[in-house]
Amino acid sequence: MAEIQNTENNYSASNIQVLEGLEAVRKRPAMYIGDISEKGLHHLVNETVDNSIDEAMAGYCTDIEVTINEDESITVQDNGRGIPVDMHAKLHKSALEVVMTVLHAGGKFDKGSYKVSGGLHGVGVSCVNALSTRMKSQVFRDGKIYQQEYEKGKPLYPVKVVGETDLRGTRQQFWPDPTVFTTTHYQWDIIARRMRELAFLNAGIRITLRDMRPNEEGKTREEVFHAKDGLKEFVRYVDRHRTHLFDDVIYLKTEKQGIPIEVAVMYNTDYSENIHSYVNNINTIEGGTHLTGFRAALTRTLKAYADNDPAISKQIEKAKIEIAGEDFREGLTAVIAIKVAEPQFEGQTKTKLGNSEVAGAVQQAVGEALSNYLEENPKEAKMICDKVILAATARIAARKARESVQRKNPMTGGGLPGKLADCSNRDPKKCEIFLVEGDSAGGSAKQGRDRYTQAILPLRGKILIVEKVLWHMVFESESVMNIIQSIGVRFGVEGEDDKEANIDKLRYDKIIIMTDADVDGSHIDTLIMTLFYRFMPKVIQEGHLYIANPPLYLCTYKNKVKEYCYTEQQRQAFLDKYAGGVDDGKSIHTQRYKGLGEMNAEQLWETTMDPKTRLLRQVTIENAAEADEIFSMLMGDDVEPRRKFIEEHATYANIDA
């Protein structure tokens, strides 16, 4: 738990610092919450919950309730100390009003109130207030209920007492402004993912999520997220569809140089490295100094153990291999969570930790804990070292395979794959490539495309299930190599990790997966997304991967009105409009597109490829740990969860993603 330097009794208006006013938020909302689409909408929930999490991290809150109300408003209630309501010395108004109406006002900026804070990365609950048509704040404190309501960030009346209570804490309810957001419909899955993550990261806290919007059967929904063992449970959850090398979780929780550090590690029989890192509950997708410290400790400690064990060092000598840092991380799943009082974030998405002091602290903590584990568990230590030797052998084979491939790589003067119909424009920022399922659809796509900016790569045969193969075998798959060569990704560029994908010479700004609008198509989408997620994650992180959205139907009314329908709902809307909701088979004609090959070149261009009219879904990774767990499930041996997931998500391959 974070240290508290103020006691509960003196957390008051004097601890609330004010940094700037609210006017700018409504003018430029995207600057404050990232965007005004679904992502920004859900960010409002995260910002509100962050206040409650700060109270939990400070040791004052054990329960948080998040409710999606029937009218799409959100209620967040906790049992913390309650936002202070006394008068603010400088502004001569209630501290609650200051917190709710001034951007970046809050106890988290006053070092005495919270030593660390997750919400600091965001913009505070006042931003939520500014972007809501209505908001109601209630504080349960000193036996009273204090209340204030707002419209678009402006208070409707001063803070007042509206009743008495035995409760303690804060309740916030807000109604997002439909004139600001492109959608105000909340997705259960997106909120649930973040609440689950927060429960894992804050051991012992109980987060209850309710959805009061009745489903088709008239039922509401509730789920409780609670992880008594925190990160130990988190790493097991992420790894639950993989086969473990051994059942232990290597775990540490300590403090070094004033930095609280918690790490959980498991080894599995797969071949990818999956490390998820967090700073103050924020997912640092781009890594940073804490990840650098972890990797350095892992390499140094395991190498020292192998060197000092005569049997293992003899094994390495016999195999004639030199072990590299990456070999120690193959088949490793880890969650690293640290708390930093003043985090410095860098990188493209501001999700990379820059604090230099953190690397040494994490390296020291992990080094000590891992050394102790290896000494106390020689059997498991031997299993890890055997896997490391196998990884090193495979890496050397991969380098040879890669070098033979890169001799023919477009970036080194060789030819492009013969199947690629390239575009004539040479400016990558203006170019896009379609990865098209099957030759017949590839033919239509080649005819229908804009040859100046659009390239087509038909994919024939099975896409390799990359989750299940040794790293070097990926380079032996023709379909995978065609993709890698075509888009211009290079591996093991001088000075980089052998497995690091370098996208500096990416040949296209958009890489678009175009498959049939059915379950098989969704499965192929998933295989290709897994390839990028596991081997070329930067392509996704930097926003280059998309999924095309071909129509499901062409609906015609009396040969006069034609409409492409991309969902079952759109088809029903067409029937409602022209035929009283029923397909009578006379005035209405419905053509179901079972595959891309059923469309001619003109139709394919019009519906799926024309930048002016097409629907593209960008593949993003909002929550890397959840994506990791989903991808390992989709590529795992258990057929039933995979079939269920793909059938449920066939109309939208949103794995966040």
Q: Model-found features: residue ranges?
A:
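C-terminal interaction appendages of subunits in large macromolecular complexes
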Residues: 393-412, 427-432, 443, 447-449, ...
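A short glycine-centered beta->alpha linker in the GHKL/HATPase_c
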Residues: 82-87
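Conserved short strand/loop->alpha-helix "switch" segment adjacent to the catalytic nucleotide/phosphoryl-transfer site
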Residues: 27-45
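GHKL-family ATPase ATP-binding module
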Residues: 1-15, 22, 44-46, 54-56, ...
